[in-house]
A protein has these predicted regions:
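Catalytic machinery of carbohydrate-active enzymes
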Residues: 1-169
Length: 169
């Protein structure tokens, strides 16, 4: 009988853009360790479409686990019990660690988040601009509207054009 070879796949389960970008050093480390590119299933496939360490990008909504050898998400590495922990033992405040450092032993020089955007030659952008994304997934990361306004006004006064990013709504 012929057994179909399944592809290795790394699942980036975060729906937030920032957390997804922070997973890019992990992808590079895994690819270098295994000596091959692999598939990535994610909520934001655009982030990985030109990444040289990724063979194929799959939108997580259409992801079929049966076709892939699953490699854990970077947020679940070392997770022993997905149903929870009955008792607390040796509790550590994990907020002291960077998310991409958990379980992958990344060296400081390996922690740079790399982004490989598609070439946009036809898009004529000014030479000095900054993108501002005032919408966050988590309430604890939300900055007051007044603070965003102050930042944007300060940038504008310095001659820097501001491009606002965010959700459609």
């Amino acid at each position: 009988a012929v057994v179909a070879r399944r592809e290795k796949c790394f699942v980036v389960g975060s729906e937030s853009l920032g957390d997804t970008l922070c997973s890019t050093p992990t992808l590079k480390k895994i690819s270098n360790s295994y000596g091959e590119k692999f598939c990535v299933a994610t909520h934001v496939p655009e982030i990985f479409s030109n990444n040289p360490y990724v063979k194929k990008v799959v939108d997580i909504k259409s992801f079929n686990k049966n076709k892939y050898d699953i490699f854990e998400t970077c947020w679940s590495v070392g997770k022993q019990n997905s149903r929870g922990i009955e008792k607390k033992h040796n509790v550590i405040d994990i907020r002291q660690f960077h998310a991409i450092d958990l379980g992958f032993n990344l060296l400081p020089e390996e922690m740079e988040c790399e982004f490989y955007p598609a070439p946009y030659e036809d898009l004529k952008l000014p030479s000095n601009y900054v993108c501002v994304h005032p919408v966050q997934t988590w309430g604890s990361r939300t900055w007051a509207k007044e603070k965003w306004e102050q930042l944007i006004n300060k940038l504008t006064k310095q001659g820097i054009r501001v491009v606002l990013l965010g959700q459609d709504s």
